[in-house]
Design a protein with these regions (language model features):
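Catalytic NTP-binding/metal-coordinating core of nucleotidyl cyclase/transferase enzymes
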Residues: 3-88
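Catalytic core of nucleotidyl cyclases, primarily class III adenylyl/guanylyl cyclases
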Residues: 57-84, 99-133
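Acidic, glycine-rich loop-and-strand cores that form catalytic or ligand-binding grooves
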Residues: 91-97
Length: 133
């Protein structure tokens, strides 16, 4: 029996689905952590990943946070037009960029982590196709 047939026989909540997979990843994360004070670095990354998750969910469904990467999915019907997903990504990116600017301006700390906030960026990887929950 092939994989598609096996998945088709599974309960609906664990079967093969069509939809969007999205990974939002903070760029500059590794250099940021290795070159700065960890206490403030973890607080900064935590605040930024929380912002990303809150901006994407809903309509996306959160799956996992892996370090600096937020992984989400949405079934095909969530976005009637693909442009809506692009708009969600754009809004998330703008919120992230604005938060980085706000954090940079608001800090009075001179530690390496706080001084390097502006070096962080955000990139997205998205795919539409079949997946298993």
């Amino acid at each position: 029996m092939n994989l598609t047939a096996k998945l088709a026989n599974r309960p609906d909540d664990h079967g093969l689905r069509e939809g969007y997979l999205l990974l939002a990843d903070i760029s500059g994360y590794t250099a940021f952590l290795t070159g700065t004070e960890l206490e403030h670095a973890h607080e900064i990354i935590g605040e930024l990943t929380t912002l990303i998750r809150e901006r994407l969910e809903p309509p996306m469904r959160f799956v996992k946070l892996e370090g600096d990467a937020v992984f989400c999915y949405a079934e095909t019907g969530t976005f009637r037009e693909g442009e809506r997903l692009v708009e969600l990504i754009e809004a998330c990116y703008c919120d992230f960029a604005n938060r980085v600017v706000d954090m940079t301006r608001a800090t009075t700390c001179r530690c390496g982590a706080c001084a390097a906030i502006s070096s962080l960026g955000l990139k997205f990887i998205t795919h539409h196709g079949s997946y298993v929950v």
